[in-house]
Curated annotation (Swiss-Prot):
This is Urease subunit alpha. CDD domains: Urease_alpha (cd00375). Belongs to the metallo-dependent hydrolases superfamily. Urease alpha subunit family. Ni(2+) 1 binds at H134, H136, K217, D360. InterPro entries: Amidohydro-rel, Metal-dep_hydrolase_composite, Metal_Hydrolase, Urease_alpha_N_dom, Urease_alpha_subunit, Urease_AS, Urease_asu, Urease_asu_c. The modification N6-carboxylysine is found at K217. Pfam families: Amidohydro_1, Urease_alpha.
Length: 567
């Protein structure tokens, strides 16, 4: 039997079981847990390689082979870190396993044929496209920024650069909802829109859901009163949608305890749980300890650095239409910015107590930095807290799975769309992101939407090959013509689909049905279901989890930063 050195094998086919990779310039290392390919029967495309007629490529017709195969991919997902081939058929993941020609190769479960395109996954890390659940739809260009960061699904609300949208993720009422659905239909990214949930009677909520809202947002700027919360959750239970809440910073309609009482035992998604983004001051962070609350962070406070506090005041004044000349407005802003709770947020993420990461796009958060900041936090926590339980000195697999779940599967579960997106699993949309390990989490090598390339770094168009400088991200064919409709999905409530909204508005994108939002809890948050008892000192803002103070130093230096953005 012929042999090949481990180094030569990795260079040719990518890492295999037991090999380790460093993620970007962090101190995080993954180790390959399993290899689904067959040694000696790997498929690879190119001159003198395997995927040729009668060798790795079979003779079958279109219906019997996959449309796209990603060869020798290193999959990083909440369920594992494995080496495999990925087959794509009709825009969805057909299989994860061994690709090739079953006529001449053993163990083939993904058939490569004349109709199959090849994406070279050798040496690449593949993740599911990110799901950002806190989008202020201030400008349509956010879609490009999100896609080029590795995010493929936007959930939020708004109507453009107006006061209501600058402050809240709300698309209010039937007319606004329909116009925005018509607008986002043209974007090459998956979209779901929130209606306004700040209503104390049910009729105005039902009509928004029937008009196309995939969920409702309660926000203090519109009134996050106990009556509105109670009513909104009643309608959510009735119509199977999720409720997102930015609670009452000023405690005008009630304190934290009144909000928890209004919520009862019903599930709700709490945004920026730390509080700098808004919510009961100073104790909204206690919601991390509630079994029916799905806690999330937005990225402006993540991770805690020496600059975090200083930049927040001005951002907050702009986003919430506050006047720096009015003392009460300044006091409102200052009440939300607390070093102690910001520091505790990092630790709660590392413990798996905060389940979701999101952006708060152009409304204090940065739409293109959800993934970067997630991994910066993971790195900071490894350096400050050491090896996570379940990990060892050789790999950080458990920590890596915990953090990738925060922006992929958990937000998808929270909003009833995990049957379509959020992980690299059979049957789901082939929204996949390929990374060179050195650029992991920072700059994708390819962003695929429903199996077709949507964005990629591309060199001089007049060059003889694709790579000469200047290289920058450009939209690819999934963003053009009718293909963009087949490559993206609009998420709608079941009620709006039954009411015929896609047909009435002539929506051309794929339609995804929101379901299963009301029978979940914190326990449903994969790798991030820890529910500690949170104590907060209202005078010093000290945070304790199960009696242990949560204290960490601000970072003075971060990975995945300036060295990646010189050009």
């Amino acid at each position: 039997m012929a042999h090949i050195s481990r180094t030569a094998y990795a260079n040719m086919f990518g890492p295999t079981t037991g090999d380790r990779l460093r993620l970007a310039d962090t101190e995080l290392f993954l180790e390959v847990e399993k290899d689904f390919t067959t040694y000696g029967e790997e498929v690879k495309f190119g001159g003198g390689k395997v995927i040729r007629d009668g060798m790795g490529q079979s003779q079958v017709v279109n219906s019997e082979c996959v449309d796209v195969v990603i060869t020798n991919a290193l999959i990083l997902d909440h369920w594992g870190i494995v080496k495999a081939d990925i087959g794509i058929k009709d825009g969805r993941i057909f299989g994860i396993g061994k690709a090739g020609n079953p006529d001449v190769q053993p163990n083939v479960d993904i058939v490569v044929g004349p109709a199959t395109e090849v994406v070279a996954g050798e040496g690449k890390i593949i993740t599911a496209g990110g799901v950002d659940t806190h989008i202020h739809f201030i400008c349509p260009q956010q879609a490009e920024e999100g896609l080029t960061s590795g995010v493929t699904t936007f959930i939020g609300g708004g109507t453009g650069p107006v006061a209501g949208t600058n402050a809240t993720t709300v698309t209010p009422g039937i007319w606004n909802m329909h116009r925005m659905l018509e607008a986002v239909d043209d974007l090459p990214i998956n979209v779901g829109l929130f209606g306004k949930g700040c209503v104390s009677k049910p009729e105005a909520l039902r009509e928004q859901i029937e008009a196309g809202a995939m969920g409702l947002k309660i926000h203090e700027d519109w009134g996050a009163t106990p009556a509105a919360i109670h009513n909104c959750l009643n309608v959510a239970d009735e119509m199977d949608i999720q409720i997102a809440i930015h609670s009452d910073t000023l405690n005008e309609g009630g304190f934290y305890e009144e909000t928890v009482k209004a919520i009862g035992d019903r599930v709700i998604h709490v945004f920026h749980t730390e509080g700098a983004g808004g919510g009961h001051a100073p104790d909204v962070i206690k919601s991390v300890g509630e079994p029916n609350i799905l806690p999330a962070s937005t990225n402006p406070t993540m991770p805690y650095t020496i600059n975090t506090v200083d930049e927040h005041l001005d951002m907050l004044m702009v986003c919430h239409h506050l006047d720096p000349s009015i003392p009460e407005d300044v006091a409102f802003a200052e009440s939300r910015i607390r070093r102690e709770t910001i520091a505790a947020e990092d630790i709660l993420h590392d413990m798996g107590a905060i389940s979701v990461m999101s952006s708060d796009s152009q409304a204090m958060g940065r739409v293109g930095e959800v993934i970067i900041r997630t991994w910066q936090c993971a790195n900071k926590m490894k350096l400050q807290r050491g090896i996570l339980e379940g990990d060892n000195e050789h790999n950080d697999n458990e920590r890596i799975k915990r953090y990738v779940a925060k922006y992929t599967i958990n937000p998808a579960i929270a909003h009833g769309i995990s049957h379509e997106v959020g992980s690299v699993e059979k049957g789901k949309l082939a929204d996949l992101v390929l990374w060179n390990p050195a650029f992991f989490g920072v700059k994708p090598a390819l962003v695929m939407k429903s199996g077709l390339v949507a964005y990629a770094p591309m060199g001089d168009i007049n060059a003889a090959i694709p790579t000469p400088q200047p290289v920058h991200y450009r939209p690819m064919f999934a963003c053009y013509g009718k293909a963009k409709f087949k490559s993206s999905m609009i998420f709608l409530s079941q009620a709006s689909i039954e009411a015929g909204v896609p047909e009435k508005l002539n929506l051309q994108s794929q339609i995804g049905e929101v379901k299963g939002c009301r029978n979940i809890s914190k326990k449903s948050m994969i790798h991030n279901s820890y529910t500690p008892n949170i104590e907060l000192d209202s005078q010093t803002y000290e945070v304790k989890a199960d009696g242990v103070p949560l204290v960490c130093e601000p970072a003075t230096e971060l990975p995945m930063a300036q060295r990646y953005f010189l050009f």
